[in-house]
UniProtKB/Swiss-Prot annotation:
Pfam families, alphabetized: Glyco_transf_56
Catalysis: reaction(s): beta-D-ManNAcA-(1->4)-alpha-D-GlcNAc-di-trans,octa-cis-undecaprenyl diphosphate + dTDP-4-acetamido-4,6-dideoxy-alpha-D-galactose = alpha-D-FucNAc4-(1->4)-beta-D-ManNAcA-(1->4)-D-GlcNAc-undecaprenyl diphosphate + dTDP + H(+)
Domain of life: Bacteria
Cellular component, GO annotation: plasma membrane
Species of the source: Salmonella newport (strain SL254)
Pathway: Bacterial outer membrane biogenesis; enterobacterial common antigen biosynthesis
Name of the gene: wecF
Main location: membrane
EC assignment: 2.4.1.325
Described purpose of this protein according to its UniProt entry: Catalyzes the synthesis of Und-PP-GlcNAc-ManNAcA-Fuc4NAc (Lipid III), the third lipid-linked intermediate involved in ECA synthesis.
Membrane topology value: Peripheral membrane protein
Recorded family membership: Belongs to the glycosyltransferase 56 family.
Enzyme class: transferase
Gene Ontology biological process terms from the UniProt entry: enterobacterial common antigen biosynthetic process; fucosylation
Protein name listed in UniProt: TDP-N-acetylfucosamine:lipid II N-acetylfucosaminyltransferase
Amino acid sequence: MTVLIHVLGSDIPHHNHTVLRFFNDTLAATSEHAREFMVAGEDNGFTESCPALSLRFYGSKKALAQAVIAKAKANRRQRFFFHGQFNTSLWLALLSGGIKPAQFYWHIWGADLYEVSNGLKFRLFYPLRRIAQGRVGCVFATRGDLSYFARQHPDVRGELLYFPTRMDPSLNAMAKECQRAGKLTILVGNSGDRSNQHIAALRAVYQQFGDTVNVVVPMGYPANNQDYIDEVRQAGLALFSAENLQILSEKMEFDAYLALLRQCDLGYFIFARQQGIGTLCLLIQADIPCVLNRDNPFWQDMAEQHLPVLFTTDDLNEQVVREAQRQLASVDKSGITFFSPNYLQPWHNALRIAAGEAE
């Protein structure tokens, strides 16, 4: 029997760390198909912190892709589980036959599904990638992303799967510790990545609430982002008084991030694609409602779980926010499909499907 190989095809330390720790701590002990990884980027202590996994690291996305293609060609029974996939060479290999559809299983993280960049090289590549994605053996994704993908590729199998957000089920009641009165505090974006469209989001918040709310913008990740942070701060201070705007430029530890979320009343996410599920989960867990772009298909997942959804096009005010908080507080968090531990069983199913052990 050929063991399934997992591929992290781009050097995204935060996401890769989350996936590797999840596999090491939760899946590796019960499945031999959860232990082999090929990773783009440096070790960064992963080998030491994930002793249950067999990890191979590659200095570039291209080097990793070449190694995957060589393995795929050498053994056509070898199957790969691709997580995310911000790797042009791998899509081209699937398109050209270097990797066969029966070898290619893909967990959609969001960015590689949507065509949001206006750069010329991206606009030229998107049609090729779209064709290649129609050759995937099976995709795993959120409900909203599965719906989006199926409109383009109705013949490709799709299975529900959620990114393994680090969650403590005992915190499902942490909202009881939160204060829900006074001036609203609004979290804008889930990181410092430009995909959060921070400036547009700040303008939208100002248009809805004026300079009457506290605005918190977490921008400690990714690193080496000071120019963009300064740009966002300047734009924010043109809208909000200094005491109402908090730009967080330092990376935060998980417990500190949870403490920050407990101070918030609303999350505001203007991006038009699925991303930031981890932050959304932690907000929902704390009974903090989220404002989404109507083009972000994750609203379908939230509605399926009977969670209140606010949209950027809604008329928002404190009364609307407090009512959404009340509705969230009435939801039994233990039954939410994309919360831990409920997302575990779909992961076990996904491993069996990708390994060829389940129909």
